[in-house]
A protein has these predicted regions:
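N- and C-terminal low-complexity/disordered segments
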Residues: 1-88
Length: 88
């Protein structure tokens, strides 16, 4: 099984669109499109999860545009593109 390394970016991005999923009567939002350095990236699929860092809880999202996977962090009102990797 081949693994692809996450290429670190660590840059603040603007989430310009969201989509919503209703799972077990719990409505959750996911980033649908981000703007990074004037370029728009639209996502086809992804998953979100919570990570506890000390007393702080951070949302992470692994989103795919079909060619690349983007890891996003949502903390407070800030969205950060942690990194990306090519889809294997």
């Amino acid at each position: 099984m081949e693994t692809t390394t996450l290429f670190p970016i660590n840059k603040e991005v603007n989430v310009s669109a969201f989509y919503f999923k209703n799972s077990r009567s719990n409505l959750r939002s996911y980033p649908k499109q981000i703007e990074m350095d004037g370029t728009l990236v639209s996502f086809a699929d992804g998953l979100g999860y919570l990570v506890r860092k000390g007393a702080q809880i951070v949302q992470l999202f692994d989103m795919s545009d079909g060619n690349n996977t983007y890891r996003l962090r949502h903390a407070g009102n800030e969205w950060t593109l942690i990194g990306m990797k090519a889809v294997a």
